Amino acid sequence: MPAVLDTPVAIRRTAMDLLARREHGRVELTRKLRQRGAPPELIEAALDRLVEEGLLSESRYLESFVSYRARSGYGPARIREELNQRGLQRADVERALKECGVNWQEKLQEVWQRKFAGELPVDARERARQGRFLSYRGYPLDMIGRLLSGRGGDD
């Protein structure tokens, strides 16, 4: 039987359980607690307290999310869009992408190498296919163009 979330203690316990599994953003944690039936005013108070105690941190969430998605082979545009959909501030998202320490050109090269075995496209159709794949993964078109023309990051 699911726990009844009608007291601050129960809401805090549930929020802590969710945070123990992985970092969450405030918007995401609020949504999950509401889905479990917690009243909005109690959620806000509980989350404010978690922020004060340093247990809920947007910057930690952004850092872990960007790192995880970059390791999974996604580019900055895709990660930016996913974070914007999660209701995070655009300035915070941009800062996290800048400070993550990921070399996006190297990541693009790794993803391309893994998917296409380093085979440069021989015709326009193959170039378009590879470009679409890399674009869908969230890499900028200028980087993709340099890579597929054989110039890589040597500009």
UniProtKB/Swiss-Prot annotation:
Question: What InterPro entries does this protein's entry cite?
Answer: RecX_HTH_1st (IPR053926), RecX_HTH_2nd (IPR053924), RecX_HTH_3rd (IPR053925), Regulatory_RecX (IPR003783), WH-like_DNA-bd_sf (IPR036388)
Q: Which GO terms describe its cellular component?
A: cytoplasm
Q: Where in the cell is it found?
A: Cytoplasm
Q: Which domain of life is it from?
A: Bacteria
Principal subcellular localisation of the protein: cytoplasm
GO BP annotations, alphabetical order: regulation of DNA repair
This protein's UniProt keywords:
Cytoplasm
Q: Which Pfam families match?
A: RecX_HTH1 (PF21982), RecX_HTH2 (PF02631), RecX_HTH3 (PF21981)
What family does the database annotate?
Belongs to the RecX family.
**What's its job?**
Modulates RecA activity.
Please give the name of this protein. Answer: Regulatory protein RecX
